[in-house]
Amino acid sequence: MWYVSTRGMAPRIDFKEALFSGYAPDGGLYMPEELPQLGRETLHEWSTLSYPSLVKELCSLFIGPELIPRDDLNGTSGDTGSAAIESVQGAKNVDIIVLLPKGHCTKIQELQMTTVLRENVHVFGVEGNSDELDEPIKTVFADVAFVKKHNLMSLNSINWSRVLVQIAHHFFAYFRCAPSLDMHPLSPVEVVVPTGAAGNLAAGCIAQKMGLPIHLVVAVNSNDIIHRTIQWGDFSLSKAVKPTLASAMDIQVPYNMERIFWLLSGSDSQVIRALMEQFESTKSVSLPKELHSKLSEAVTSQSVSDEAITQTMGRCWQENQYLLCPHSAVAVSCHYQQVDRQQPSPPRCCLAPASAAKFPEAVRAARLTLDTPAEILALEHKEARCTPMRKGDDWTRMLRDTIEDLSQQWQSGLPVGLSLVVLVEHCAWCILELAGPGTKLLCDCTSTRYCVMTLKVWSLGFPKMQTPSPHPAAAAAAAAAKSLQLCPTLYHPRDGSPPGSPVPGILQARTLEWVAISFSNRESEK
């Protein structure tokens, strides 16, 4: 399987190179050169699998067996621990750089990042929003020599591996909600995707292209660039980001739309390059008529106000005693609109990305009460530490200098290992775990949106690690698998259970991040 840039000016690469990369050198995003097509027999087989097993089978279609032995992708479900920054605090082999947008995330989210006063945690409070934070990250990744020197890697949805594992959400949702897989043709299922940067939406479009009969509904808040693009072909910025209760979706530049445009254009890199270069230059572009037609056929969309978010949270609690986070409520609001119209519809699944505990402002706005965990209450009384990145500062230089300083510190005392730069998304996901003394699971299940983390994971311990497994990386992957996070799924079933019933459904598994263990191990053995 080869991977190509959406803009067509970068060399094609294999999965390993796609995994350890961010933006392509030409500014595009990596996509598979070809998509596998799945028949009815494969769908039947996959419908009986657990979520981790489904992820494993899906990944095997996109990763050559010569790169990833099957033993390296074992996994079982379970609960994650705390957020990534909490997981690695004090670890001797990890440094974390966190960039948070001051005023654009909840107080709890900010405290979770700024109250960790360990030597290996470096938090910056940026006077900017998430789109503005993307710019220095993109600039850093555009410097190919710098990226190679420091082995930098992005694990937000810029990285193909992030989108790949999200494809499994849509297959699993379909298998849980489809009335039967024996119908000809297969019955469709509607998947409502609360959308910010559009990574999960891109995953859904890929699942469609692979043969999964789903209809995608894009649910956005008042930052409605995707809604306007689908409705009228207007891919243009508003005057400013609008702060909403669903703060993780307060995004004006949904960069994964480039992947969707490329997919629906028939992989026409020339068209996409011209389109995206115009957008980057003028902040506004009208989609070509044919591309807009294909987009509106593939997905529909709705924009949801803060008032609708709070009404949905209240209604879901009243009807189901289930407390939605505001992002989940954006999706469920679309569901309620269809229910209230009493229009016939296929089974429907709403993806639910986060816990309401991190959004007390939204809970209060919905006139609901929240049983706040003691760990979150304790944050109010902790000392905080945060270095400002002010408007007018050179954020790119500050980020580069920090990465270089940390690399220099490590290189002066430890062998060079694996460095990762991560932009943390709003949903639960596992990054990487190394099996060895002093190492911990790196995961985010607490919506610490907009963070950039540099994770330095050293391969020093792999050759000497005592383990009965013939592959230390496999042991590490198995250990990481025990700490996956199950997120609740809300769906409109046909089996008689109440609409909106919470079920253990969409698992934010990040199996592919474990692949990094395998590569790190093999390089150290060489």
Please name every model-derived segment:
Residues L420-K526:
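Small-residue-rich alpha-helical packing segments, especially N-terminal targeting/signal peptides
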Residues M1-G417:
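PLP-dependent amino-acid enzyme catalytic core
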